[in-house]
Curated annotation (Swiss-Prot):
Location of N6-acetyllysine modifications: K643
Biological classification of the source: Eukaryota, Metazoa, Chordata, Craniata, Vertebrata
Domain of life, source organism: Eukaryota
Motif (Arginine finger): 528-531
Residue positions binding ADP: R619, E622
Signal peptide: none
Name of this protein: DNA replication licensing factor MCM6
One CC-aspect GO term: nucleus
Domain MCM: 346-553
Described function: Acts as a component of the MCM2-7 complex (MCM complex) which is the replicative helicase essential for 'once per cell cycle' DNA replication initiation and elongation in eukaryotic cells. Core component of CDC45-MCM-GINS (CMG) helicase, the molecular machine that unwinds template DNA during replication, and around which the replisome is built.
Source species: Bos taurus
């Protein structure tokens, strides 16, 4: 209950003053706490902090609830249970405390904020039983509204008798006096607000949502509106995971009060001709519809990051210095960080500690680790920003631990967002413009990339995204901004995030005979924006399979014993925070080495078997620079050294060079035919007609020869590509030179044998080469669809000579086939 004054009808100028003795006692005890509580050095703890409040921009004193409990247990209990009731009195005690020591403006208000509450509640635990209690909740900010002035205490002028009515408290909506305080005047409605003499405070609404860790399985995240006032405004941005300390309150639901349906309900009772209402009393059906529209809102007095020291928004803070980070740590923690920086095997130990449950895939672990350290963002003299964040894409067969990497990073990084490409749209990934229910203004609601600002955005099933949605993140991946022009809102928002994506190959399994670009459903612009591509192939290897199976069984049977970490996750977070404040410069020696390695990549691009997965561009040069800077940061170096560039080049080389391609099986069609023949009517079944009994004892003479499996004819992939390119080039040359462009299959075989005449030394070799070229042509026609057979089947007058056409058809190149560079 707040201090209130009310005028009794006919009581003249006498006012009945209602006193809240409990609140006044709390005010006195809280003033004693501010004046008497001392820190370990014997100084009054809050004296200096209170004296700073005389500055114009300051008005809030943050008090530790632990100190309050130590000073007076009964006072802390009363404040916790009756917070909304006693809060104005606590603010008055603070104003008295400051006023006794410094001169302050009379109109200035002061506010108290509490932190370090012992218990933290989830959003779904907030019920009506917690209204008015001091509570601490946590959640992730998903929407922020602009800051507005809020009327907290109004001064009104009576338009009938000109009486000035001061200090009319506003109850979360515009509240006029019930009646004029002049006993002669009976005005109840005609009042004018005097804005010059009223008191306003900064006011901001934010919407928070349950974090993924708090969410029960299968539940939809709940959200809650939080009201911030005074110094608390602009202290939380979209994507922050914060603790809010305050109380749960009930406010009128303005959006429900102003809905068209409610308005129509009240306007339907119109007066008739005789002044009577056309409708009678309709019972309880509409009783109180407009009066019972209330909702729960959290009024916060203090906002703090969920893990303020080595979590929350400070993990990726670029403005930290080594000294400020050292001051946040204990002596023991700082010694551990220093010990880690001197570790000779730091690179390997960090990888094994970060992903202890994933066997193998060491290159992927190294790439993801360097992504967490990141490069150095730069701004050119013209104002162009060069990103420092590293983007990584993992492509691989099913069950190769792609999603596990994403989940590990999401759990480790305090500002990481996990999403699925198939279930996400462009607005959900970038940002959406939505209309506010109360003010009807358009506000921006953060998407996954904005929520992961200064963090990591993990996108699973990246290849399943629609092309329109992939285009939406082009700008975010390179410029690290999101531009929005919708519904009159034009804004450029920050999305300084690293993207860790996982994608599946097109056919479900990675085809080694094709390049990376042909294996995944991603456009060239998206692929060029990734710094690293890692390809995981599920191979049948007895040693590897045994090691993986042993690791999985160990995890299921002895979870604690099987996880072997050199460093704990908290130690890695502390080391990451310390290492990221380094901004290494590239030395002249490293600069020359980077240029040399880039030239090697460019020369290798498109040269024979080592042809790269996609075009090497300047973006790959920038990727090498970022990876080199991340290596230097990891070793806490102020300068990029050639050994850092060498490791960056090695990692980049892993993703750029084509995965080792197997030999091409030219007897694939015969193997397939054999499988068909071995069906129910083949070896295991019974043939329709018995085989003729010939040879010894009724068995075939060639049975012993046929029983031995014949080795399939295989050709090296590079040789297969060379022969196919020769055939395509020859046929296209014939198309350009002659009118009759098509060649018969036999003519094409004879042409090829003449071309390689110098390589043939014997009749047996000639037969072998002829067999190979015939198999290659068959595969190009029926499997790769590079060549097309022209027949006369079905044409009029085509009966004559049709058999020869079937046996020896004309061949032309598929017009849709593009010869690879």
């Amino acid at each position: 209950m707040d201090l209130a004054a009310a005028a009794e009808p006919g009581a003249g100028s006498q006012h009945l003053e209602v006193r809240d003795e409990v609140a006044e006692k709390c005010q006195k005890l809280f003033l004693d706490f501010l004046e008497e509580f001392q820190n370990s050095d014997g100084e009054i703890k809050y004296l200096q902090l209170a004296e700073e409040l005389i500055r114009p921009e300051r008005n809030t004193l943050v008090v530790s609830f632990v100190d309050l409990e130590q000073f007076n247990q009964q006072l802390s209990t009363t404040i916790q249970e009756e917070f909304y009731r006693v809060y104005p009195y606590l603010c008055r005690a603070l104003k008295t405390f400051v006023k006794d020591r410094k001169e302050i403006p009379l109109a200035k208000d002061f506010y108290v904020a509490f932190q370090d509450l012992p218990t933290r509640h989830k959003i779904r635990e907030l019920t009506s039983s917690r209204i008015g209690l001091l509570t601490r909740i946590s959640g992730q900010v998903v929407r922020t509204h602009p800051v507005h002035p809020e009327l907290v205490s109004g001064t009104f002028l009576c338009l009938d008798c000109q009486t000035v009515i001061k200090d009319v408290e506003q109850q979360f909506k515009y509240t006029q006096p019930n009646i004029c305080r002049n006993p002669v005047c009976a005005n109840r409605r005609r009042f004018l607000l005097d804005t010059n003499k009223s008191r306003f405070v900064d006011f901001q609404k934010v919407r928070i949502q349950e974090t993924q860790a708090e969410l029960p399985r299968g539940s939809i995240p709940r959200s809650l509106e939080v009201i911030l006032r005074a110094e608390a405004v602009e202290s939380a941005q979209a994507g922050d995971k914060c603790d809010f300390t305050g109380t749960l309150i009930v406010v009128p639901d303005v959006s429900k009060l102003s809905t068209p349906g409610a308005r129509a309900e009240t306007d339907s009772r119109v007066s008739g001709v005789d002044g009577y209402e056309t409708e009678g009393v309709r019972g309880l059906r509409a009783l109180g519809v407009r009066d019972l529209s209330y909702r729960l809102v959290f009024l916060a007095c203090c906002v703090a990051p969920t893990n303020p020291r080595f979590g929350g928004k400070e993990l990726r803070d670029e403005e930290q210095t080594a000294e400020s980070i050292k001051n946040q740590m204990t002596v023991k923690e700082w010694e551990k960080v220093f010990e880690m920086s001197q570790d000779k095997n730091l690179y390997h130990n960090l990888c094994t500690s970060l992903f202890p449950t994933i066997h193998g895939n060491d290159e992927v672990k190294r790439g993801v680790l360097l992504m967490l350290f990141g490069g150095v963002p730069k701004t050119t003299g013209e104002g162009t920003s060069l990103r420092g964040d590293i983007n990584v894409c993992i492509v691989g067969d099913p069950s190769t631990a792609k999603s596990q990497f994403l989940k590990h990073v999401e759990e480790f990084s305090p500002r990481a967002v996990y999403t699925s490409g198939k279930a996400s749209i462009a607005a959900g990934l970038t940002a959406a413009v939505v209309r506010d229910e109360e003010s009807h203004e358009f506000v921006i609601e953060a998407g996954a990339l904005m929520l992961a600002d200064n963090g990591v955005c993990c996108i699973d099933e990246f290849d399943k995204m629609d092309v329109r949605d992939q285009v939406a993140i082009h700008e975010a991946m390179e410029q690290q901004t999101i531009s929005i022009t919708k519904a009159g809102v034009k804004a450029t928002l920050n999305a300084r995030t690293s993207i860790l994506a996982a994608a599946n190959p097109i056919s479900g399994h990675y085809d080694r005979s094709k390049s990376l670009k042909q294996n995944i459903n991603l456009s060239a612009p998206i692929m060029s924006r990734f710094d690293l591509f890692f390809i995981l192939v599920d191979e049948c290897n007895e040693v590897t399979d045994y090691a993986i199976a042993r690791r999985i069984v160990d995890l299921h049977s002895r979870i604690e014993d099987s996880i072997d970490r050199v460093y704990s996750l908290d130690e890695i977070r502390r080391y990451l925070l310390f290492a990221r404040q380094f901004k290494p410069k590239i030395s002249k020696e490293s600069e020359d080495f980077i240029v040399e390695q880039y030239k090697r990549l460019r020369q290798r691009d498109g040269s024979g078997v080592t042809k790269s997965s996609w075009r090497i561009t300047v973006r790959q040069l920038e990727s090498m620079i970022r990876l080199s800077e991340a290596m230097a940061r990891m070793h806490c170096c102020d300068e990029v050294q050639p050994k850092h560039v060498k490791e960056a080049f090695r990692l980049l080389n892993k993703s750029i060079i084509r995965v080792e391609t197997p030999d091409v099986n030219l007897d694939q069609e015969e193997d397939a035919q054999m499988e068909v023949d071995e069906g129910p009517d083949g070896i295991n079944g019974h043939a329709d007609s018995p085989a003729p009994a010939s040879g010894i004892n009724g068995h075939s003479e060639d049975m012993n020869q046929d029983s031995v499996p014949k080795a399939s004819l295989r050709l090296g992939f590079s040789e297969y590509c060379r022969i196919s390119n020769l055939i395509v080039l020859h046929l296209r040359k014939m198309e350009e030179e002659e009118d009759e462009s098509a060649l018969k299959r036999s003519e094409l075989v004879n042409w090829y044998l003449k071309e390689i005449e110098s390589e043939i030394d014997s009749e047996e070799e000639l037969i072998n080469k002829k067999r190979i070229i015939e198999k290659v042509i068959y595969r190009l026609t029926h499997y790769d669809h590079v060549l097309i057979e022209l027949t006369q089947a079905g044409l009029k007058g085509s009966t004559e000579g049709s058999e020869s056409y079937e046996e020896d058809p004309y061949l032309v190149v598929n017009p849709n086939y593009l010869l690879e560079d």
